[in-house]
Structure formats: structure tokens, C-alpha cells
Swiss-Prot record:
Monomer. It comes from Caulobacter sp. (strain K31). Keywords: Porphyrin biosynthesis, Transferase. This is Porphobilinogen deaminase. NCBIfam families: hemC. The keyword Manganese does not apply. Coiled coil: none annotated. GO terms for cellular component: cytoplasm. Binds 1 dipyrromethane group covalently. It catalyses: 4 porphobilinogen + H2O = hydroxymethylbilane + 4 NH4(+). Tetrapolymerization of the monopyrrole PBG into the hydroxymethylbilane pre-uroporphyrinogen in several discrete steps. Belongs to the HMBS family.
Amino acid sequence: MSRQPIRIGARGSKLSLAQSGLMQARIAAALGAGPGDDIDAFAQLIPIVTSGDRIQDRRLMEIGGKGLFTKEIEEALLDGRIDCAIHSLKDMPAELPPGLVLAAVPEREDPRDAFISHVAERLEDLSKGARLGTASLRRQAQALHVRPDLEIVMLRGNVDTRLAKLERGEADAILLAQSGLNRLGLGHITNSWLDPLAAPPAPGQGALVIETRAEDVDLPWLQAVRCQATTLAVAAERGALYALEGSCRTAVGAHARLDGLILTMIVEALTPDGVQRFRREGSATLSSLDAADQARALGLELGGAVRAEGGPALILTE
């Protein structure tokens, strides 16, 4: 094949390579790869180590926020070393660097948070004062809202690292994204799931996204991997994230569901200690002409209402 392969940038973690490998196969097929073809001749995966992967002993908010998972990859995209990037959408900041766009979102995996423990089947069943491991401010606040007695243990690292810490007894239970467990072939270890209506996951959780330079957004192969229903749901969720100025210093959850042309959504934000919770629910009937704009507008409206009610109390200041 004379054409140069598409160069796909992705984090070098085990989970990132697993999910990026799935997208590599999809992209190669969209470019014409057949069952027996070498997909690397059509789409080449280029692992990039990010600052977020290198620094594992502190919360993201202490070292620069979600952008640390994307900065080096986006620099490679902007200077032409790669042609596109694969990310977990929940890791993407509310605003992107100039010149880059979220070009395609494939079908979403399970968006729920998974509860994993050797001593309890559900979060509600943990003993008084039990230790819950998470580095997510949202998961911390949602857990403390229903179980204020829990001790939150800061637990960063990849999935294997967190599971190993659980095995060593550093926590009595942990919360992880079910989508990541599924993509690693570990979906069976989950004890139970958090209800996404009672505890909405991070905006975009469970979805992957292909980021490109703005001038490449209409390339034909991108259209082949897009899922319209997921695209609209995450447009609403990211609209809420933007309205709430979501970051690693805010506990923001959003979950949108598309049924036909009706998009239903719930948005919530909590104070970091979980004591106060502010939430809004709403729906919109989408038209075929400007559905993405309408979906985002719903998220902006609900997120704006939550922000107006919660105010400065929603931001972790220390």
C-alpha cells in the first residue's frame, strides 16, 4: 500500500493501549483493511507517556489537573508527529487547545462506576469507618454523601495498581470505571454498580474519543467510526461540564440518555465533603438539523442552574 498509515497517538498505559487497539482496528477497517491485512499498514499506534502517567503519588489537582493526561499527546498532534489521538473522554478537559477538535466518538461502553471489595457487596454494606480508595473528587463526594462515616484513601495509579493496593489491604473497597474493566477483560470482578441516576458518572465516562486537528474533522474515515447516539449524549454531558467549569477541583457528575429523539439528562455537583448536593434533571426533543447544538444546550442549561445554586462551595480550595 503506497499511502502512509494514519498515526494514532495514545497514552502508554495498559488500559489506554487496550482501548486504543480496539480503535486502531476500527480505523484500519474504515481505511479499507480486510480480515487478513496487517492493520499497522493502515493505522499505526504510537504510545506517548504523559505527565499524568509519570506522577502517581498525588491527586491530579495537585499536579495540574486532567490536562496532564493529554498535554504531550496534543503537542504531538499539533506539531504533526501524529495524525489523531485516542482518549478516554472523561479525561478530556472542558476546553481544548486552539486548533484541535473532538472529531469522532464511537459507541459508548458501560458508563457506570464499579464497586469492588472483598468485604462487602455494595457501598452501602461497608462497615462503619471503612476505607474507600479513590483519587476522584466526584467519587469521594458521592460516596460521602450517602456514607459520611467512610474514610477516603487517596488511590491513584492504573487499574492493576489499584487492584493490587486493594489486595494488600490499603483499602476495604475501591471504585473504578466499569468500561475500563470491560476493556481489560476484568468485567467479572465487579461486586456491584453505582446507579448512574443516583450517582451520575463523570461526563463522558465509558466513551472514547478521537481528537484531530480542526482541518481534518471531515476526513471520511472519521465518519465511519462515529456513533450518533453517543455523540449527542456526551455533547450534553460536556456542555454541563463546561457550564460548571468542571475540573479535578470539582465533584461533577452527568448522565444523558437518548431515546429516539428525546434526550434525558441528570447533572449534579457536590461539595467536596459530600454534605451538599445540587442537581438538575431535564430533557429536550432533538431535531435532525442541529441535534448536537441542542444536546449541548441542554447540558449548558442544567449545568448552569447547578452552578448558580452551588456557587463557590463546589470548588475545592485546599
